[in-house]
């Protein structure tokens, strides 16, 4: 049988970078690694929990792309690469006002007020998440800082695309329709070179589990210089768990 290696680990140091940046002794390494996994777990858990509790259902391509952790002697710095924060966590999205250079002073003041409210809500939600992680963990370092980094193009991020498909499946959208829509959005808005999506499990409630996949463009898994983003994500449906895999070919190059 064919053996498939993880596309991200296969390209680590070539086109992929590490998500944890720190040095440790042999005794510290296992503890730091476990702590990093717990930090990521609790952040993802917080986001998913509040998405389900929120009254807002039209998240689109919003979610967490990746979480980078940097350690200093006295500080743990967690950088969350995300799209749609904090609108995916709070009830009632803040609608962004269209900007125009020829607006009156009144409209300009209104825009400033909207931006001020957005920054205020972002800070509040980030602080809530920080407190949640602090309560859930006993961190080795005393200081713990969390910052946000906005994803420039969410359609090129495999994690965000997989989360979008999972939400569609959990809302009982047909799996083929969800796959085709995600591929169309990635090709048109993400300007990706290729994308492949695979869904496995009891599709449409069938008694026998099967695997379905769709691909558009090139996805060269054996080319090391190919920048490929990959994600495996579970979807909790009425008939059981569906496994979603997404490969996105972003282009060629070296880190």
UniProtKB/Swiss-Prot annotation:
User: SUPFAM superfamilies given for it?
Assistant: Prokaryotic type KH domain (KH-domain type II), Ribosomal protein S3 C-terminal domain
Write the record's keywords in alphabetical order, separated by commas.
Chloroplast, Plastid, Ribonucleoprotein, Ribosomal protein, RNA-binding, rRNA-binding
The positions making up the signal sequence are none
Q: Name one Pfam family in it.
A: Ribosomal_S3_C
- Report the InterPro entries cross-referenced here: KH_dom-like_a/b (IPR015946), KH_sf_prok-type (IPR009019), Ribosomal_S3_C_sf (IPR036419), Ribosomal_uS3_bac-typ (IPR005704), Ribosomal_uS3_C (IPR001351), Ribosomal_uS3_CS (IPR018280)
* Localization annotation: Plastid, Chloroplast
**What Gene Ontology terms describe where this protein resides (cellular component)?**
chloroplast; cytosolic small ribosomal subunit
Per the UniProt entry, what is one GO biological process? translation
Coiled-coil positions: none
Region (Disordered): which ranges? 96-121
The molecular function GO annotations come to: rRNA binding; structural constituent of ribosome
Q: Which domain of life is it from?
A: Eukaryota
Q: Where is the composition biased (Polar residues)?
A: 108-121
Which cysteines pair up through disulfides? They are none
Which coarse location class applies to the principal site listed for this UniProt protein? plastid
Residue ranges of domain KH type-2 in the record: 51-124
Matches recorded under NCBIfam families: rpsC_bact
Subunit comment: Part of the 30S ribosomal subunit.
Recorded family membership = Belongs to the universal ribosomal protein uS3 family.
What protein name applies here? Answer: Small ribosomal subunit protein uS3c
The source organism is Chaetosphaeridium globosum (Charophycean green alga)
| Record lineage | Eukaryota, Viridiplantae, Streptophyta, Coleochaetophyceae, Coleochaetales
Gene giving rise to this polypeptide: rps3
